[in-house]
């Protein structure tokens, strides 16, 4: 549930490498 400081409107989360995932056009970790 922690914002990763990245949006995923046009491209996937680069921060998915550290466990972030796309939710509501923003990348979150848990």
From Swiss-Prot:
Role noted for this protein: Probably participates in a plant defense mechanism.
Cross-referenced InterPro entries: Cyclotide (IPR005535), Cyclotide_bracelet_CS (IPR012323), Cyclotide_sf (IPR036146)
Alphabetical list of Pfam families matching this protein: Cyclotide
Domain notes: The presence of a 'disulfide through disulfide knot' structurally defines this protein as a knottin.
An example Gene Ontology biological process: defense response
Disulfide bonds: 4-20, 8-22, 13-27
Cross-linked sites for Cyclopeptide (Gly-Asn): 1-30
Modification after translation: This is a cyclic peptide.
Keyword Disulfide bond set for record: yes
Keyword check for Disulfide bond: yes
Similarity-based family: Belongs to the cyclotide family. Bracelet subfamily.
Name of protein: Cycloviolacin-O5
Alphabetical UniProt keywords: Disulfide bond, Knottin, Plant defense
Organism field: Viola odorata
